Amino acid sequence: MRALVLLLSLFLLGGQAQHVSDWTYSEGALDEAHWPQHYPACGGQRQSPINLQRTKVRYNPSLKGLNMTGYETQAGEFPMVNNGHTVQISLPSTMRMTVADGTVYIAQQMHFHWGGASSEISGSEHTVDGIRHVIEIHIVHYNSKYKSYDIAQDAPDGLAVLAAFVEVKNYPENTYYSNFISHLANIKYPGQRTTLTGLDVQDMLPRNLQHYYTYHGSLTTPPCTENVHWFVLADFVKLSRTQVWKLENSLLDHRNKTIHNDYRRTQPLNHRVVESNFPNQEYTLGSEFQFYLHKIEEILDYLRRALN
């Protein structure tokens, strides 16, 4: 009888633990508004994501560009999983990022945030001047001074995230994403795994990897630990509309619903300083000139891809 009671207690405790860990963005008792009740750091003063208001970003010419090694084509097998919230790819420890202060970070995993619910197609976590972009890519790293990610994730200087926005227009297919997107069909349900053979993260990122915004914040999902050095790239990844649609509509969550709008709302800046290593050209050159310059760049980029 005592053994039966013990088993029942363990079952109930396990069910409670599973419920507590099953956070969501917009549904149930553990939606985004209730994260701080179970994960106190989510109610902290240095939370992410934030709105990057360019007129208030401080240009710091002493900030060097990011030095990335191992981001180019790598042979091997790379696990890819539907974790119920997004798609996540495990990355090799040979991928490293050295930042302006000399700290070396080791890549751990990459994942995506997107929109797609009803008429809302934009799903980036960070916004720029209040504008939410279509998708946001996160490459999570840990400080190489620590032996593992598990140790670093609790350290005050433990983590760094490289973020990039995705832009969608009438672009042709971005073939650097073709293999990744084709594998989404293999992980429709939470917990399902597949394997990518060969991976080139550098080609999945924007062409310009040197211009970025940076600030100190947190993980954007529970436990929302405030130990993340953020690097948000200024340039964009370009995907076709079909590719974006497939990413937004291929995976199901733990409630058997399509994963849509898997992003956290922007958090208060709370007197933090956001820096960039490039001047804000929109305001130094004039907004109208910058608008037409951007349009010309888009047309040239489209023609280059069409001719290849």
Swiss-Prot record:
Enzyme class at the top of the EC tree: lyase
Keyword Ribosomal protein: no
Residue sites binding Zn(2+) per the record: H111, H113, H138
Cleaved signal peptide residues: 1-17
Known glycosylation sites: N67, N256
Catalytic activity, EC: 4.2.1.1
Activity regulation description: Inhibited by coumarins, sulfonamide derivatives such as acetazolamide (AZA), saccharin and Foscarnet (phosphonoformate trisodium salt).
Gene Ontology cellular-component terms listed: cytosol; extracellular exosome; extracellular region; extracellular space
UniProt tissue specificity: Major constituent of saliva.
Disulfide bond keyword on record: yes
Pfam families, per database record: Carb_anhydrase (PF00194)
SS bonds (residue pairs): C42-C224
Domain Alpha-carbonic anhydrase: 21-278
UniProt-annotated location(s): Secreted
Coiled-coil segments: none
Single GO MF annotation: zinc ion binding
Keyword annotations: Disulfide bond, Glycoprotein, Lyase, Metal-binding, Secreted, Signal, Zinc
Catalytic activity field: hydrogencarbonate + H(+) = CO2 + H2O
Cofactor: Zn(2+)
Positions annotated as active site in the UniProt record: H85
Gene Ontology biological process terms, A to Z: detection of chemical stimulus involved in sensory perception of bitter taste
Annotated substrate binding sites: T220, T221
Role noted for this protein: Reversible hydration of carbon dioxide. Its role in saliva is unknown.
Name of the protein in its database record: Carbonic anhydrase 6
Species name: Homo sapiens (Human)
